[in-house]
Swiss-Prot record:
GO cellular component: cytoplasm
Enzyme Commission number: 3.1.3.5
HAMAP family, alphabetized: SurE
InterPro entries in the cross-refs: SurE, SurE-like_Pase/nucleotidase, SurE-like_sf
Intracellular or extracellular location(s): Cytoplasm
Organism: Psychromonas ingrahamii (strain DSM 17664 / CCUG 51855 / 37)
Cofactor(s) listed: a divalent metal cation
Protein name per UniProt: 5'-nucleotidase SurE
Amino acid sequence: MTLLISNDDGVYAPGLNALYHALKDLADVKVVAPDRNHSGASNALTLENPLRLQYLDNGFIAVSGTPTDCVHLALNKICITVPKLVVSGINHGANMGDDVLYSGTVAAAMEGRFLGLPAIAISLAGQTHFESAAFYAKQLVGKLLASPLSTDQVLNVNVPDLPLAQIKGIKITRLGKRHKAEMIEKSVDPRGKEIFWVGPPGKIAEAGDGTDFHAIENGYVSITPLKIDLTATEQLSDLTKWLDK
């Protein structure tokens, strides 16, 4: 039995290493990850350039592409045995609310699900207690292997950046919301050309009870099921009426 692991922080990221060591006792683990940080890459595929592989001494494979490239390449060319599950993470920072639209971590899991496999994305709401995220990753992956989910969904998991003993449990949540990000930093490079830096995500706009933000803020692991089908089904009838006016 094989598990495929990827991430968006890159093949040398501590979170990826923590995830590998947490899961290696459950199955044969194949690690295929970007050769550098691709945070915020979303579902981008590399179409204009070839992908190059680097086989590392620890058995990991580094790819000169995005998280989605890594999973796409792994499932179509690298993996001899079809994995039972795609696991993405452990991300260095939370992926909650609108973050999931930009997240390379979530995108890697989405690509696995798009190609027909169960998938889970795991993020730590900080950069310290990877052991806590690794513990919950092992528990949840073990449960998915024993009792696979049959619906077309990806599990988006966020873990509080706390010592394991301080985490209160797990909550099933919905996505919260952020205000739009407005901060763009304008600067000048050494040659006098203007450059721009995209700022941090917008502030939290909706973090009520039942949201991923609320769970993390109160010391709980958040699990949010995500759908690949983005169709706003509830709006189909209204849109038809609007068109017929």
